[in-house]
Amino acid sequence: MINPNPKRSDEPVFWGLFGAGGMWSAIIAPVMILLVGILLPLGLFPGDALSYERVLAFAQSFIGRVFLFLMIVLPLWCGLHRMHHAMHDLKIHVPAGKWVFYGLAAILTVVTLIGVVTI
């Protein structure tokens, strides 16, 4: 018999943020590390492609703020989701683990939002 009132899970929301963060970490973050962490210090960019003024102007634009927000928040959710499930897999029971890890991710998301908005 089918239960007419099944218990709903909040896990799909967290899996969605985990998946988005994993994709962002796998595709966008390595490119940014290559560009800003390796090519820029070696002087392999033409002229003032990433001068301070241009980077600041980008960071203060709407698209730049969204990019910075996603660059910080999505890998954060992915990492904390992994930590939550790693603790579960290792049988290390954190009291109210879901609240600890996802709550921390939510708090850091709000802190990041405040930081990005006030650039």
UniProtKB/Swiss-Prot annotation:
Main location: membrane
Induction record: Regulated at the transcriptional level in response to the cellular availability of the alternate electron acceptors oxygen, nitrate, and fumarate.
Keyword Ribonucleoprotein: no
Ranges that cross the membrane: 9-35, 61-89, 97-115
Cytoplasmic compartment residues: 1-8, 90-96
GO molecular function, one term: succinate dehydrogenase activity
Subcellular location: Cell inner membrane
Residues where a menaquinone binds: W15
A UniProt-annotated Pfam family: Fumarate_red_D
A GO CC term assigned to this protein in UniProt: fumarate reductase complex
Membrane topology: Multi-pass membrane protein
Stretches in topological domain Periplasmic: 36-60, 116-119
Keywords, ordered alphabetically: Cell inner membrane, Cell membrane, Membrane, Transmembrane, Transmembrane helix
Biological processes per GO annotation: anaerobic electron transport chain; anaerobic respiration; bacterial-type flagellum assembly; fermentation; fumarate metabolic process
Family: Belongs to the FrdD family.
Description of how the protein assembles with itself and partners: Part of an enzyme complex containing four subunits: a flavoprotein (FrdA), an iron-sulfur protein (FrdB), and two hydrophobic anchor proteins (FrdC and FrdD).
Primary role: Two distinct, membrane-bound, FAD-containing enzymes are responsible for the catalysis of fumarate and succinate interconversion; fumarate reductase is used in anaerobic growth, and succinate dehydrogenase is used in aerobic growth. Anchors the catalytic components of the fumarate reductase complex to the cell inner membrane, binds quinones. The QFR enzyme complex binds 2 quinones in or near the membrane; 1 near the [3Fe-4S] cluster (QP is proximal to the [3Fe-4S] cluster, on the cytoplasmic side of the membrane) while QD (the distal cluster) is on the other side of the membrane.
Stated name of the protein: Fumarate reductase subunit D
Organism: Escherichia coli (strain K12)
Gene that produces this protein: frdD
